């Protein structure tokens, strides 16, 4: 029996990443966009065995649900400004570095734009400097970007704990805000993190 769509789906097709954890972020960054399912005519779809038709329609639904981001004029403008800020953001450690804020009504693509830019920035940094950072006695994994999802209930201590959790540090919730900040700052420095995306969602 022919199975033209049998290879479209796999057990690993679910992409339920936790972007607030290093492993989830790297999985998202390193995964290529979903491939477009092959085009079939109505007659070809109707002639498919039931299981193949189910798989094919599921693959189409997933592909359509994950289109984009689409390079609209607004998106291009955001990228240009972020590239200008990050491109000039080469101050030494004792100097204050500039930041950018994306502000708009809900549903207009702030998170989509931020994630698309951060993904491209992450890949560029890895291409430029490699996946590891040499240190005395070994090496650290290069982590160019950190992503944090915040709410109105986030405190300084919980923010620092989220940073520690992103880097997969042991006992990320133990210690004072200052202690957690020192642990997170060491990872930022040693892993050569150059961009921190803070995605604030006020659901209160």
Over which residues does each language-model region extend?
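Short, internal active-site loops enriched in acidic
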Residues: 103-108, 152-153, 202-203
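Mid-core helix/loop region of P-loop NTP-binding domains shared across ATPases and GTPases
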Residues: 38-54, 92, 137-142, 154-162, ...
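Residue-level preference for the first positions of well-ordered beta-strands
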Residues: 97-101, 145, 195
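Alpha-helical scaffold elements adjacent to nucleotide-binding pockets in ATP/GTP-utilizing enzyme cores
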Residues: 81, 113-117, 158-166
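Walker A/P-loop nucleotide-binding motif
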Residues: 94-116
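A short, basic N-terminal segment
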Residues: 1-96, 127
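Long, charge-dense
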Residues: 128-153
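Post-Walker A helix-loop "phosphate-sensing" segment adjacent to the P-loop in P-loop NTPases
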Residues: 120-133, 169-170
């Amino acid at each position: 029996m022919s199975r033209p769509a049998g290879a479209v789906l796999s057990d690993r097709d679910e992409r339920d990443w936790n972007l607030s954890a290093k492993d989830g972020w790297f999985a998202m960054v390193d995964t290529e966009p979903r491939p477009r399912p092959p085009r079939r005519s109505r007659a070809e779809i109707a002639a498919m065995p039931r299981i193949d038709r189910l798989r094919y329609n599921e693959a189409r639904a997933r592909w359509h649900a994950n289109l984009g981001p689409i390079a609209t004029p607004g998106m291009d403008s955001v990228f240009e400004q972020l590239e200008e800020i990050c491109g000039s953001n080469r101050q030494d450690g004792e100097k204050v570095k500039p930041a950018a804020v994306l502000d708009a009504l809900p549903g207009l693509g702030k998170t989509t734009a931020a994630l698309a830019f951060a993904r491209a920035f992450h890949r560029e940094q890895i291409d430029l400097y490699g996946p590891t950072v040499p240190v005395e006695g070994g090496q650290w994994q290069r982590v160019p970007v950190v992503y944090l999802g915040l709410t109105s209930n986030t405190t300084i201590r919980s923010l620092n704990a989220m940073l520690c959790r992103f880097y997969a540090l042991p006992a990320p919730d133990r210690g004072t805000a200052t202690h957690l900040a020192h642990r997170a700052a060491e990872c930022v420095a040693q892993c050569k993190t150059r961009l921190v995306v803070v995605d604030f969602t006020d659901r209160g």
